[in-house]
Amino acid sequence: MLQPMWVLSDSDLATIHSATVELLKSTGIQFLSEESIELFRHHGFRVEGETVFFTEEDIDSALKLCPPSFTIHARNPERSVEIGGRRPIFSPIYGAPYVVDFEGNIRSGTLEDYQTLVRLAHQLPNQDMVGYLLCDPGDVPAGKAHVHMLHASMTCSDKPFMGSSTHGSRGVEDCMRMGEIFFDSSRAYLREHPFCISLINSLTPLRYEKGSCEALMAFARDRQPLLIASRVTGGATGPITMAGVLVLQNAEILAGIVLAQLVSPGTPVVYGCASGIMDMRSIVVSLGAPEFSKILRAGVQLGHHYGLPCRGGGSLTESCDIDAQAGFESMSTMLNAMAYGADFIQHSAGCLSSYLAASFSKLVMDDGICSYGKAMREKVDFSEEALAIDIIKEVGHGGEYLTHLHTAMNCRSAVWQPAYSYRGGLNAWEASGKPDIREAIRERGKQLLAEYVQPDLEPRIRERLEAFVLAYKA
């Protein structure tokens, strides 16, 4: 594995941390939850109304309790993932209200669309997880959408998934109860074997809303890992300067981490870098901008400075179609996240139009970008076989390697192969009708769905999950 490419000096890190401490100490963070406020007050924090103030000692004490890595357990143990380990973990798009299907039709998401996205994520070889809220299934009641999405994650894939942090403490309890059914286990077992990681977003600037506080505290009590994130938009919800964005983001994330550790010391957390800037002409969040990658790079370095695994994103773009813009922006943001050492890459595949749309084709395309990035991160093999000194001597001056046994024995493993990119040359491409990569991606996706086989799940567990969803009262 290649070492991360750092951008901040030790002096820069100290400056950001010092400014963050000053902000938390003098201005504080609002928690719009009486339960959270009472917990802070119980532990001796300075509280004024809904605003909590933090000292550097409060921050340091919480950070010391956070594990540097942890495992998310899948029902199929071979699918379990370590976050904070030696490689990034990929989880697809999150939170899209719209869907773009293989034919290019744009519509509000449905439960069937959601299930299709989960099946695609299950089939794609580089997606480690199947996420949560891949699209908003608008054809089911909002109050029970989370149980339908969890049911899809549990029954359409055997990869690990994310938890339901969108419905406050009730959504957490539903997630845990479904987890007990799915793993055929007790709550105590799940606390020792975490099965989901859940996104907790601050309400920037300098706030956590009630539902997020409830979900954070409930998941922490059950020892489920938390992805505590801040999504500052420079020029809109935060300063337009990169340094200002980093300070505001850092303050919000650290405050959430402190709350998690007060609830349950040792709760696994991920430092969630999700901030960017607004294009002031279009008033659109600019995910493909170089500023987004610079903020991500610095944020990941800062999180690692604190000893925490870090989130980065992903295959991101403002483009509304599978076009050149989508390709170069998604490749840039993904490879930057991987080069900077992000441990958990959310929105790793499927994003169009600045988080607004989950695209079936984009999910397939971006999985190829994930594969490309993984190949770039691999160290060069300097084994005796790879050095091939004897082969070079044998072939000698002016020889060729195309027909040599060494080439035949190693050609499949030594060179990365794309799943859908064209490599046939100009004349062959013209002779074959000038095939379009977008069509190749669509056909690849349709093939994956045609080959999909639902993972085995004991009938009694499947029946209990279905009964839970059917009986659920929104």
Regions found by a protein language model. Name each.
Residues 4-19, 27, 32-41, 361-474:
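Catalytic-core signal marking the mid-to-C-terminal active-site face
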Residues 38-105:
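Glycine-rich, N-terminal phosphate-binding loop and its surrounding beta-alpha-beta segment
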Residues 335-357:
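Glycine-rich phosphate-binding active-site loops on the catalytic face of alpha/beta enzymes
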Residues 109-339, 343:
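Helix-rich catalytic cores of soluble enzyme domains
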